[in-house]
Amino acid sequence: MAAKDVQFGNEVRQKMVNGVNILANAVRVTLGPKGRNVVVDRAFGGPHITKDGVTVAKEIELKDKFENMGAQMVKEVASKTNDVAGDGTTTATVLAQSIVAEGMKYVTAGMNPTDLKRGIDKAVAALVEELKNIAKPCDTSKEIAQVGSISANSDEQVGAIIAEAMEKVGKEGVITVEDGKSLENELDVVEGMQFDRGYLSPYFINDAEKQIAGLDNPFVLLFDKKISNIRDLLPVLEQVAKASRPLLIIAEDVEGEALATLVVNNIRGVLKTVAVKAPGFGDRRKAMLQDIAILTGGVVISEEVGLSLEKATLDDLGQAKRIEIGKENTTVIDGFGDAAQIEARVAEIRQQIETATSDYDKEKLQERVAKLAGGVAVIKVGAATEVEMKEKKDRVEDALHATRAAVEEGVVAGGGVALLRARAALENLHTGNADQDAGVQIVLRAVESPLRQIVANAGGEPSVVVNKVLEGKGNYGYNAGSGEYGDMIGMGVLDPAKVTRSALQHAASIAGLMLTTDCMIAEIPEEKPAVPDMGGMGGMGGMM
């Protein structure tokens, strides 16, 4: 085991803060409508230009082990916020840097770090509650477009295309982002259902470029058990072969001889088939198979209801216009199911959502509604160069996450104003402990930092703007994009409440851990001995 470098106290904390500052200073320049670009060198291809905080954070690795630990902890803030809300990574980083900087002053002055952390936690809990109170629902297409635009660095075209996608596939539908072929952004909407299971063998692929198996006008066989014996399948395969159409088999599993025979038939061109595992587990799998059956107009072949694989006919099989099977996902497009039956099924699942007790069950049921009722929308990002395409795609993905978050928990005034207004909840928050009260003060000051940074990036004077915004009430704030003061929601500067909440909670969580750190341990790199020079080889003195 390699030797370790163990360091204690203020000295090591300062190194950690240095790491935090290096990473945060690189990320914070991207904040706001006038945020600057960061150019990242890549080992392959051209440099990557981005305004996405988490992309910048992920690229940073520092030489000093202790500074690097600080940087990695703040990177965690950005990543966690990105995972939960899909946006707000830069805001979270700016908040974390501010809480750490303020907190370190108090720790160095001799205050109890644990009490400071408790104070910070109490302040954040009060702010989160206040944010919930001031959030307003985000229902209209116009509001969705505004949220999308703000998240895509004030690109109105991106906001509009996301709002259109949500309108077409429903707020619960599947929306994906892909590289486009033209200079303009395009929206492609496909009515269909997507589930997270891919082909069981790469030999099923028939589109090498996209790495998918595409089936046009296929039959769909749904079976709730494993298929390992090809004899069980033969009667159905013969009927499908006579109809000269491809077949998708969705079963608990397809293995052994059955899978091998399907692959061989596919390679030889005898019968175009693809096998995938059924999505979900246990009772949820049965329910999802039933969903697919209703969508495609087929029947789930199950021994529980007296149906067997050997006696299955073409009438038992579902059908669709097209099915695309990738490595991890299968998309059923234009199933032949009866619209009335699909609606009845959706209504039935919505009923289950109302009676479900656990959040997990509700989430899974919600997903099933999305897959049945919605469709699949593909936003194709257009750009002149590959470098611009990557940058634009980052922003579109951010905007998509932000709009989903807005629909979920509502919106608040953007541009850092919501956090300033939520401060009102801290004015009268007294913990009865001087050190904890100091923790509350840390958060009170830190919530100004996002607005200060937005103004600084726009070339304004942060203190002047913050004071003027604090003099106002409600949604009154500063629009850095246009340089005007006014009603932020009226001007279309909105942030999803979920993004602001997640940024604050994750920033405070990691910053609190940093303040209570008193020892850091890093590995001492082993010094590799230099390779000695090769001495003159004997007996070769006469050679020039």
From Swiss-Prot:
Q: What SUPFAM superfamilies does the annotation carry?
A: GroEL apical domain-like, GroEL equatorial domain-like, GroEL-intermediate domain like
In which compartments does the protein localize? Cytoplasm
Q: Which residues bind ATP?
A: T30, L31, G32, P33, K51, D87, G88, T89, T90, T91, G415, D495
Enzyme Commission designation: 5.6.1.7
This entry carries the following GO cellular component terms, namely: cytoplasm
ATP-binding is among the record's keywords: yes
Query: What would be an example GO MF term here?
Result: ATP-dependent protein folding chaperone
Stretch forming the signal peptide: none
Please state what class of enzyme this protein is. Answer: isomerase
- One GO BP: protein refolding
Task: Please give the InterPro entries that the UniProt record associates with this protein.
Answer: Chaperonin_Cpn60_CS (IPR018370), Cpn60/GroEL (IPR001844), Cpn60/GroEL/TCP-1 (IPR002423), GroEL-like_apical_dom_sf (IPR027409), GROEL-like_equatorial_sf (IPR027413), TCP-1-like_intermed_sf (IPR027410)
| UniProt xrefs under CDD domains | GroEL
Q: Which Gene3D superfamilies match?
A: GroEL (3.50.7.10), GroEL-like equatorial domain (1.10.560.10), TCP-1-like chaperonin intermediate domain (3.30.260.10)
Catalytic activity as recorded in UniProt: ATP + H2O + a folded polypeptide = ADP + phosphate + an unfolded polypeptide
Q: Which UniProt keywords apply?
A: ATP-binding, Chaperone, Cytoplasm, Isomerase, Nucleotide-binding
Its function? Together with its co-chaperonin GroES, plays an essential role in assisting protein folding. The GroEL-GroES system forms a nano-cage that allows encapsulation of the non-native substrate proteins and provides a physical environment optimized to promote and accelerate protein folding.
The UniProt subunit note reads as follows: Forms a cylinder of 14 subunits composed of two heptameric rings stacked back-to-back. Interacts with the co-chaperonin GroES.
Q: What is this protein called?
A: Chaperonin GroEL
Q: Which species?
A: Neisseria gonorrhoeae (strain NCCP11945)
